[in-house]
Amino acid sequence: MAITLNLWTHESSLFPNDAVLNYDLVPSAKPGDIFEIRAQNGDEIALQHNHSSTGKLHAKREKEPVYLMPSPLTDDLKRRHPNLQLSVVSHISSLLNIKNREPVVVKICEDKTNLEAEHVVIFFRDQFISRSDMWKLFRELCGKCVYLKQRVSFIGDVPGEIRCIWRKGKKCHSAYISERTKPIFRSESARFLIFIQMSEEMWHFEEDGELNYNKAIDGFLPDLFSFWRDLGTHHLVSIILFTRVEYSHHGPMCVWQPRSQKNSEKGSSIYPQNSFNASIDNEGGPYEDFFKVVVDNVSSRDWQPVLANLKLELAKFRQDVIVRKIKDENGREIEYICGRMTGSQEGNFLEVINMAVFQFQSDYIDRDLSRTGTSIIIVTPGTGLYEVNEKMLHLTSKSLLNTVVGMDIVSLGKVPLFLTPIVRYKNPVKNKKRSQLTSRISSSVSPSNVIPNSLTSSVSNFSVSSFLNNLKEDTEWLYTFPIGCNISFYSTTEMRSLRSPWENLMREHQFEPTAKMHELQMMGVLEAESAKISIPLLQSDPLLKGSVFSEEVQEDYDERQFTGEAAVSANDVLSSSSPRHFSSHTPVNVDKSSYLEMNGHSLSTVISGKESISSFGAKVDDLKSTSKESARQFGKSALTERLQKLAGNSSNVSSSLQTSSSNKSSLLTKKSSFPALLKGFLALPATVTTSANPLGFKSTIQRPIPIKNNEDSDSCKAFSQAPPIATKKPPTFLKPNSPEYAKTVIPKSSTNLENEYQTPWKIIQNPFKLKETTADNDPVSLRWEHLYMKVQDVRKFNWLSMCTPGALPLTFSYFPSEEELNDKFEEYTYTIGIDPEFTQMNQQELLAEMICQRLSRGYQIVVNPAAAVSYSGNPKANKAGTITDFSRSVNNQRNGHLTVGSDAVCLSLGDSQFHRLSCDSVGYNIEVKRYVKKVSGQGKMRYDYNFWSKNECKYVKSNITFSANDSANYNWNYVDQLICGFETYLPDSVKYWRARFVLLPMSTTSTHVFQKYQLLDHADALSDEEFRVEGIYKLSELLYKGKIDPMNDSNNKTPNTSPAELLGIKFTTLPMAQYIHSELEALRLDSSRNEQSLFMPNKRLDCSADLHTIAKEIQGPGGPKIDDITWHYRIYENCFLGSEFVSWLANTFIGINTREEALKYGNKLLSLGLFDHALKKHPLLDGYYVYRISPDYSIKPVSNRPYRSWFSRKKDSGQKHLDNKIITESEAGPSRLELSRRILFNADVEKKNGKSETVTVHYDLLHNPASCYHIRIEWLLATASVIEKLLQSWSRILERYGLKLVEAPIHEIAAVGELNPFDQVSIISLALDPPPIPERAPLVNDPVNYSKNWWNVKILEHFDFILDTEAASTFPKSITAVYSWGKPNFRYVQYIHRTGTVLVQIDDDQRFLWLPNRLHNSKVSKLSFTKSNKSTLNPNLKETAEELERKFREFCSNKDELDQFYGIVNHASDDRRSIYSSASTHASNASADDASNVNV
């Protein structure tokens, strides 16, 4: 029953709920009911006001209702707002189109199933959300009502917004989320890789007179960037140009010699093998692949300079690829045009996909927490048709199954008459038989009639019938769909949208070719009416039982042609084996004889690539039939006579057909043209673009009658089966990932059953025919099925996917039958138990975490119970249910309606792996059954290519080894043990998420830090370096606060010890090699150095003790460590640190229980003269500050000087090479040097989440304030958004102390090419060799490695670079230096710029390896633009990586500047401080005095 209530609006800050309702006004309602809320219509308003339903009341339009589940009004709100009936947020009222305090009609909805949403689309940006987080978010939404523009929250954050809801096949404003709803997640902050295929067709004109590459540069890309800008997306874009250059077998490869008349007369004899190493294609021809990075990780908002640069690169791309400089016999370099660009069909399509996917196989390394998703866009002038290598196809399919990367193909051509995208490869079974047939036919060809380098030859002695029989058995090519690819045709959709509606209406009634015809493109306007246009011949489908050449089929066709049954669907379209296929809007009254004459010229057009050849023996005039009866009389005898006539005249054709090797089609083979003519329905790259009348021209389909080809090259006789000439209505073109698309797959024939285990794809026997088969014939195509709400029409451009790429759906609707599981899969079973001592989760929570881990690895939840057959044969026993069946089970368990043992969840990785997780009835165990498909070995392929990186100025040869991830051997048992808590160590095989961060010293310090020292009246006494050291102490406090002790021995923690001491962090100003040397020397001289005791000392002193007693205790065995402390090459003898002294006071004196009390008492002792600061500069501070016992209380004699120089140490002849001697005799010292430690850390500091967000944090034990401090975070079970919030909190806190938190790559930059083939370092050399090192340079302990880079280091310091990571060779061989994550593995020393934008290494040849820090630059670029596309960066941060590189290159290439720099450094070498002040002018803002007095 509907009631009327007054609707109030409120802001989300007032009420936490989107809707609140006074349930007292609706007695039959209860919390949890769904209410339909709609605005009143005109009649209801009139009835309420006693008015007639006339006038303006009828003008009030009835809006779509909104479905909500309002929360009950609390008693407090009832008292404060007694008149409140129903209140919603303002956005819901805008959906209803009503204002505040207006009446609405409210009705309870009894049946929730009618309100269920089929799909709900959630958009998010500027954050990384894993697929496991997506599932958790959807579980929270399940059982609730959602509405458009609703902000959904997850763990306290707002990760996304609902922008689209589908219910009953239509969009709606609101709906109910049930377990059957399919969520779709789309990212507005993804990474895009845009590949532009620069094939031969890129420089071809379309019918509209526009070049293809102009469509890409002036059409598609500007539109794409404009959409991104309008949507406010924050994508990261890289654009790569690629092509394949083929070098012909026949004749010379160099066709142009512009600078050598002499060589031009002789003819070139230079072949590609003489100048470079080319790969060999499937046909045995040499080729090379080229890649050029034009844009590298640029923000999507900064697109105007990107397009300007791209146009320049496109203009010179062809010249850079095919023009070679080759030395002649005189040693002169001559430019030659070598080879030709292949067509799009023969391009390196799969190689591009593999190179893109290769870098994403390790996306768990250097995880960017501000972006989600990766999308690949391939812009091609072709139609999405590719010839590939079978082994490469197998490797690519495996790689795509193991990744969650989406891929879109943008075709600049027209929609073809076959399904795309599609790939084909040689049939390994029939290829041998085909080669034998080719040799037989070639042997019968007269050599005198064969034209060299031509595609024509004389007719063989084979009869027509024998040739047709050979065609019927032809299965040379096998076809399949690439996994996870979508295709959109830009020319037939977006160009239409740029025209006015009137122009579009007029074009619907105009002739529009559905295939590219060379004659039509080349003729003038006046020639269009009289010219003859030839199209290719027909060929039967060899895989079908019948043949269009049979009398029965021909007669049936003739009968249907004139009985109104000619209009057939695309299902009746047969494949064509001609190198091209055409379709034309031919009038209905054109009879068969006229069509035969047009086809009589077709093959000549295809082969020659020029104008139509007219020398066909007896020329036949065009015939026009005006009578249906005369057409019926054209029967078998006429066809036979015509075929014989054409066969007799074909010999006259061959002499007139000539094509040069440079103009030969890329689809045709190099050695023999026979296989090329049998390749199938494909078009030549020069005219590969086809169309299927996308504007809907109405006419009747005419199936042409096949005739004999009158031009037979080595292939003897080629027949083709033509596509429809005209269409009554445009056929339905489907996206490859839609369910209907999967139904087009034909089951494998018996000849291919032996390869069923080895191929992860399904064979398509006829791409022209849409066979109605079951969807489970191609389960791989269903992997992306649930990303689409309806059938995808390929003629509609998929802007949604290219602007906001969708994540891999969480659900999958395929599960193998019991027979398939037994025959094609291997089973692995293990059980995970719950031990309350280690596991703090119950069975359901453990099951949820196990599902999350599998979802994050690309698995999907099986939601098709009909296809899931259990092992016992009962379809219901293994019912995986829907995506939230498990979630619903958890809710039911809380309500007491669940038997735990009934839970069973199935997950799938494509159709290759299936996991079944089932709970036992006890509630402590989970059984895991893994089914791994029996496949052949993974295999590897080496790929050689030429690469032009963004940092280079030429192509450089490179290679990469492709290999699919061996996901079948992933150790899921160990991962499940980690989830249970039985294991804490993360091996590399687990592929856990990891990221490295560095703390860089900033030039300014926040004024907020001074507040800590204002009470001591020493705010102006701390230098910038001292504040940065305080920042490290603050970080140690943060780490210690969130530290997790798995043994729960928190009682053993010492509250009176500083966190830095407890974490073992030490400070030094010496380089690593010098620090190791000093430590070894100190250990040799004093073997009884104090070590931290495992036992807590007993408090034994009272605060009333006299100063002599306290001084004796300080200098005794139980006192703070007193040692010689080195700081900035100054040695402070017999000193102790302030933090250690405060800890000693708190642990020694009775009545002191906190560090604050100890600090206060210590300052009292300082004021009494017991000790003092080494430079008499600071009071007692709890940090890294140096203090010394006063001479009156010191046991050891104390020098009057506060310090002595580190360089003043005397070295005798026996100690001259002390460094090497100490290292070689280090048996007495430590054999293991620990550089970092790891702790388990709870990232959820605020504890908003119900569970512990455990991560592993690695931190440095040794820190030099002049270099970086490193933090490494690793996680497997934690939520990425929680970690991002933690890092943001750390960044805000540490910036107050002059430290900047920057993400940096884990691997050294010299090895970046091993992870990302499109990323290479830039090498910068010095134009002038540096002079010898000054004599007064600092003493070094590794002169072999350190001294040779001394000048390089000075140059880097001059440009504000600081030390990042030492090289592995820095550490002595006698010492085992280890990090908590492994041994040092950097080959070269690495530096980083103070801004964090650039990383540099120094190689063995004293060259600089330069690489921008893209992990940091991408975040800066995201924040550097407002919505108006104006830069908001601080002026100090505008120096980009490109500008830094330009200045650095200019400096290194300028001999005068280098010579001046060397002179300044040499002249200042007498005073080390002058060296640093002159060589580090830009490196530090601190004065020389500050640098010498820091922290002392």
UniProtKB/Swiss-Prot annotation:
SMART domains attached to this UniProt entry: DEP
Chief location bin: membrane
Stretches assigned to the DEP domain: 1116-1191
GO biological process, one term: positive regulation of autophagy
Membrane topology: Peripheral membrane protein
InterPro entries (alphabetical): DEP_dom, DEPDC5_CTD, IML1, IML1_N, WH-like_DNA-bd_sf, WH_DNA-bd_sf
Molecular-function GO term, any one: GTPase activator activity
Taxonomic superkingdom: Eukaryota
Key words of the record: Membrane, Phosphoprotein, Vacuole
Cellular localization per UniProt: Vacuole membrane
Residues found modified as Phosphoserine: S738
Family: Belongs to the IML1 family.
Name the UniProt record assigns to this protein: Vacuolar membrane-associated protein iml1
Species for this entry: Schizosaccharomyces pombe (strain 972 / ATCC 24843) (Fission yeast)
Classification lineage: Eukaryota, Fungi, Dikarya, Ascomycota, Taphrinomycotina
